[in-house]
Every structure is written in structure tokens, then in C-alpha cells.
């Protein structure tokens, strides 16, 4: 009798838990993009939409999202994160772990490894990832490159950036994505902003901001550091 009761109780609790889990799934868009562009509140303490509504930065990190996932996998991942209540997906265009010459769709990322020659097929894929996220109300916090392309250290590299081509690449990205409704720029990529890196990161950010006045920008430093160490007074840095 006791065993029968226990089994019935377990099945009952399983049904309740399953129902509860289904009810916990968010059914609407992750955010309301119609509230306007994001900005830093005048207090400097939080982010908000241009209509004054506070914005919760609930981010999930998927650095290799653009490089490794195909369209179907991207849709599955973004939908899963929307259901879980995330508002921001953090990812990279030129990522750390995959080769520079091929992506999930079989396209090179750059033609001949030249940062001045972005591969059209790959960046059409980048466009699609941003658009798929926008349709779900998800922001994309986008790194133009991971840090090893500026300062190899423990990464795969190669180091391909100079201040000059970083500015050109940044301006090109700014022109391409300035009207995306769901973008946050992240400069850096687990690297410092000192030494030779300073001029490159500064040029990349300045290039983007020279044409894109619509999106917030921050910096991803290496561990135990803050963007304020190097860029606190930079005109392009909106928040640390």
C-alpha cells in the first residue's frame, strides 16, 4: 500500500513539476524594441530605453554562436534563450577558437585573411543572426573581434590589426549595422588596453562611432581589470 501511494505521489509531483516548468516559459518577446535605443540613465547607475523605461541586461554568453552554428541551430538557441528570459546574447564576429578561413556555412570570414576584405557570405550570416535575435526581442552584444586578433598571447590569432585597418573595419561595421534595433557594441575581447593594444582598440571603437551614433559601447577587458583602467575618459565608452 505504501509503495503504491509513493508511486502515485511521485507521478503526481512529476505532473505538477512538468506543468510548472511549462508555465515558466516566457511566451513574449525578450524585450520591447519599440521603446527606443538604449542609453545610460542620467544617474550613471543603470541602462534605460530612450523612453525612460529601465533596461535589464540579462546576458548569455555564446562567443562562438556566429562562427559555429548554422541557421537552424541559431534559431533553436535563440528561441531557448528567449523562453528563459534572457535579454542579451554576447557573441563575436571574428572569434577565438575557430579558424579564420572557414565558418559553419563553409564561407571564409575574410577574403585572403585580409581585414579590409570581409567575406560577403559570412557577413550575410552575421546579418541574419542579428535579425533573428531582433525578431525575438533579443539584443546582440557584439564584439567585432576577439582579442587574439590584436594581441595573440594564449589565443590562436593571427594578429591582423593595426590602428589604421582597425579604424576602417570599425567604420565599415558601423555603416553596416548602425540601424540595427538590437545592438550593443563590445570592444576588446579578454585583452588589456595598454601598450600597442590601446591605439588599436581606440581606433576600432572610434571607427564604429564615427558613423554609428545609435548604439551603446563598452569594453571587455582581461580578468581582474576594468575598462576604466585605460578608456574611462574615452568619448566612445558609454559604460564600464
For the regions a language model picked out, list residue spans one by one.
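Active-site mouth of glycoside hydrolases
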Residues: 26-239
Amino acid at each position: 500500500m505504501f509503495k503504491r501511494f509513493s508511486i502515485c505521489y511521485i507521478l503526481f509531483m512529476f505532473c505538477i513539476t512538468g506543468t510548472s516548468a511549462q508555465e515558466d516559459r516566457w511566451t513574449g518577446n525578450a524585450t520591447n524594441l519599440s521603446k527606443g535605443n538604449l542609453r545610460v540613465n542620467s544617474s550613471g547607475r543603470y541602462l534605460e530605453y530612450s523612453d525612460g523605461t529601465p533596461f535589464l541586461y540579462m546576458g548569455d554568453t555564446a562567443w562562438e554562436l556566429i562562427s559555429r552554428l548554422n541557421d537552424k541551430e541559431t534559431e533553436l538557441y535563440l528561441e531557448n534563450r528567449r523562453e528563459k528570459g534572457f535579454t542579451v546574447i554576447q557573441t563575436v564576429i571574428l572569434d577565438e577558437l575557430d579558424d579564420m578561413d572557414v565558418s559553419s556555412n563553409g564561407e571564409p570570414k575574410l577574403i585572403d585573411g585580409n581585414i579590409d576584405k570581409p567575406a560577403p557570405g559570412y557577413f550575410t550570416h552575421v546579418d541574419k543572426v542579428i535579425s533573428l535575435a531582433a525578431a525575438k526581442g533579443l539584443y546582440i552584444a557584439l564584439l567585432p573581434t576577439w582579442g587574439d586578433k590584436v594581441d595573440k598571447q594564449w589565443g590562436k590569432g593571427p594578429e591582423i590589426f593595426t590602428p589604421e585597418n582597425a579604424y576602417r573595419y570599425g567604420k565599415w561595421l558601423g555603416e553596416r549595422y548602425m540601424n540595427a534595433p538590437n545592438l550593443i557594441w563590445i570592444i576588446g575581447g579578454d585583452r588589456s588596453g595598454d601598450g600597442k593594444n590601446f591605439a588599436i582598440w581606440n581606433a576600432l571603437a572610434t571607427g564604429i562611432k564615427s558613423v554609428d551614433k545609435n548604439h551603446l559601447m563598452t569594453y571587455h577587458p582581461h580578468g581582474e581589470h576594468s575598462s576604466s583602467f585605460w578608456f574611462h575618459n574615452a568619448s566612445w565608452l558609454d559604460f564600464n
